[in-house]
Regions:
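Polysaccharide-binding and catalytic clefts of secreted carbohydrate-active enzymes
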Residues: 238-250, 310-406, 472-480, 486
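Short secondary-structure boundary/capping segments
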Residues: 250-253, 293-294, 365-369, 413-418
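Active-site-proximal substrate-binding groove within the catalytic cores of carbohydrate-active enzymes
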Residues: 156-165, 375-605, 614-617
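Short, solvent-exposed loop/turn and secondary-structure capping segments
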Residues: 287-291, 362, 501-502
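Carbohydrate-recognition beta-sandwich/jelly-roll modules
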Residues: 1-234, 239, 254-256, 268, ...
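Aromatic- and glycine-enriched glycan-recognition loops and surfaces
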Residues: 204-303, 330-334, 377-387
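Beta-sheet entry/capping signal
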Residues: 231-235, 273-277, 348-350, 395-398, ...
């Protein structure tokens, strides 16, 4: 495989450099140096060869600004054999029959920076061995005839980075074995030393993700606490703010129902032992908003064409949210002051959306001091903003969106809803696997999903009413397994349980009683086995067998208009499973039957039956 490996540098000018552009190539046992007469050189040094090859790439005396380093670059046979694994959020597998051919696919490797080709007959493994904070991704291209795949592992270039480390090699082709290769290497080469989960967040047994006014949000949480007196509950509160959701950011303050009522609600929750954090966006400023002229242009990312990098998330107000560069000090200071104000209201922590979801955007804002097209500033700048918050509010936990290896030392936790509930996004080609928990379990808090007992997405009363769905159906009957499988994934993956949109009607109506029973059962199970499911160590899941079932999912999010909603059907194992070892060395097989029928299972010589919509732990 090593003889197939190449590299490529892409420059700000659009020029690319490959080995063919260097007239001199000097080789010895573990090093290869490509040189030009002007002193420009690229060096690749091999550090290890087992279980995979580990190389370092160095760039010296470059004649122009480099945007990214691509190493390794390789073309391999593909066909119908391989699925693709990559470290976005928790971890994603794209099945062979869902891969888009004839186009360049780009994915961010912000979680565990692993990319692999999987098959039962062996596969190919790649990773980005971060020894310092840096952004990574991968471009891959499967030919239209599917015979080959070209892979380019991307390392964002920065003069502050000494070497670009990467690994590659053949391996078993199992996703967990890919996780174990990286996990074993990372044990010996820590990015951050002595990382431990936040002492407050690690105790949480259930997150309630509610949106809206106090009367809708708070009473059901208090009722859940009565049902789960021995469990630690947390409220992740959205739409508390005096602006429409995904509009007029970052002007969240004051609270929608007034500061006094907001403080009273937070105090009531705290008095009942409930952890409270609220939503703010940690990255965006509304380009079409009232306060844009107060520092938006000075803070934002600009693309190569001179346009503000933005996304129109809100399909109703149709405002564009601009992405702020890590160098955007006006924005950063504004966010620090907002967090301080919210903390003074009694909040136990703060959620800042999108921060760990970023890190791969090139910024060309001419007002900024960083090099044009720099990516490293996104990571360094947002880490600096979190450091400012920690300096002014010591011990105050900040959480954000999506697993991010480069934020393990600064963020106390992350939501994982975009992968664990990816069907809501209408992405039927994604299969989630717990790659990040397999590597970093117990070192950070992971929570979140889109699991709703009703299937009805919440509606912000500050949006235009004409865009609201005029009729709703009994979605929980049309998609009877969706809530249960999404909730079960949390437990089996070792993710803190989460329920969404738990409002008074959901807490009271008989039609949702089975889902409420399942919620209580899942939280009590997680609490009972927390020594495995939070503090434990994930082991290989290989050897498990059960039947498969077809599961229908409702592909709908809050901005999905009725004509865009769709049903996604997947063939999935009827029983979810994982294997864990606690700190005492005890091993357990963890099972979740999310279906409405009894199921039969077997695992490496053990077998049994599991009741409908239940959890079990089998000692190994």
């Amino acid at each position: 495989m090593k003889e197939l490996i190449s590299w490529k540098l892409t420059a700000l000018s659009g020029k690319t450099y490959t080995p063919a552009d260097f007239p001199v190539c000097e080789k010895n046992a573990d090093t290869c140096v490509w040189k030009r007469d002007d002193g420009f050189s690229v060096t690749v040094k091999t550090c290890a060869s087992e279980p995979v090859v580990w190389d370092k790439l160095f760039v010296a005396n470059e004649p122009e600004q480099i945007l990214d380093v691509r190493y390794p670059v390789i073309e391999l046979p593909f066909g119908e054999k391989y699925d693709i694994l990559y470290g976005y959020d928790l971890g994603i597998i794209t099945k062979n029959n869902k891969i888009e051919c004839g186009v360049v696919n780009n994915v961010r490797l912000l979680g565990v920076p692993v990319f692999a080709l999987l098959s039962d007959d062996g596969g190919y493994y790649f990773d980005c061995r971060r020894l310092e904070v840096r952004g990574n991704g991968v471009d891959y291209f499967v030919s239209e005839d599917k015979k080959s795949i070209k892979i380019e592992i991307i390392h964002a270039y920065s003069k502050t980075i000494r070497a670009y480390d990467a690994a590659y090699g053949e391996f078993s082709g199992k996703w967990f074995d890919a996780a174990e290769i990286y996990r074993n290497w990372r044990k010996e080469h820590q990015l951050f030393s002595n990382i431990e989960a936040h002492p407050v967040l690690k105790d949480i047994d259930l997150w309630i993700w509610n949106r809206g006014p106090i009367a809708e949000v708070v009473p059901p949480v208090l009722e859940l606490k009565k049902r789960l007196p021995d469990c630690k509950l947390a409220l992740n509160w959205y739409w508390w703010h005096n602006i429409p959701y995904d509009t007029e950011y970052p002007d969240f303050w004051p609270p929608r129902e007034g500061e006094d009522k907001f403080r009273e609600a937070v105090k009531l929750l705290n008095d009942n032992g409930i952890y409270v954090q609220v939503y703010i966006n940690g990255v965006c400023w509304d380009v079409d908003g009232k306060s844009w002229d107060e520092g938006g242009l000075e803070s934002c990312m600009i693309d190569r064409e001179g346009e503000v990098v933005s996304t129109m998330f809100n399909q109703y107000t149709r405002h564009r949210l601009g992405y702020m560069c890590g160098e955007g000090k006006i924005f950063r200071r504004r966010m620090v002051e907002l967090v301080k104000t919210l903390q003074s209201c009694g909040l136990n922590g703060q959620y800042m959306d999108m921060i760990s979801h970023m890190g791969v955007h090139h910024c060309y804002n001419p007002r900024h001091k960083h090099a044009p097209g720099d990516v490293q500033i996104m990571l360094d700048g947002y880490r600096a903003m979190i450091d400012e918050i920690h300096a002014e509010i010591p011990g105050f936990p900040i959480t954000s969106e999506s697993c991010g290896e480069c934020f393990l030392d600064s963020l106390a936790g992350v939501t994982v809803c975009n992968s664990i509930s990816s069907e809501h996004l209408r992405k039927d080609f994604l299969e989630v696997v717990p790659l990040f928990p397999a590597v970093y379990h117990g070192q950070t808090v992971m929570f979140g999903n889109y699991a709703s007992m009703t299937g009805v997405t919440p509606w912000d009363i500050m949006w235009p009413p004409e865009d609201r769905w005029q009729e709703e159906s009994a979605w929980h009957e049309i998609y009877p397994d969706q809530y249960y499988i999404e909730s079960s994934r949390n437990i089996i993956f070792g993710i803190q349980p989460t329920v969404c949109d738990f409002y008074p009607a959901v807490a009271a109506k008989d039609e949702y009683a089975p889902a409420r029973v399942f919620l209580q059962k899942s939280v009590e199970f997680y609490h009972r086995y927390k020594d495995f499911l939070f503090y434990g160590y994930m082991l290989s899941p290989e050897g498990f067998e059960c039947d498969e079932v077809s599961v229908d999912f409702f592909g709908r999010m809050i901005f999905t208009k009725r004509e865009m909603a769709r049903t996604i059907t997947k063939k999935l194992p009827s029983v979810l499973h994982s294997v864990w070892q606690n700190k005492d060395g005890k091993k357990g097989l963890f099972l979740a039957n999310y279906t409405s029928a009894e199921r039969v299972w077997s695992f490496n010589g053990k077998s049994g039956k599991i009741a409908p919509r239940s959890f079990e732990m089998i000692e190994l």
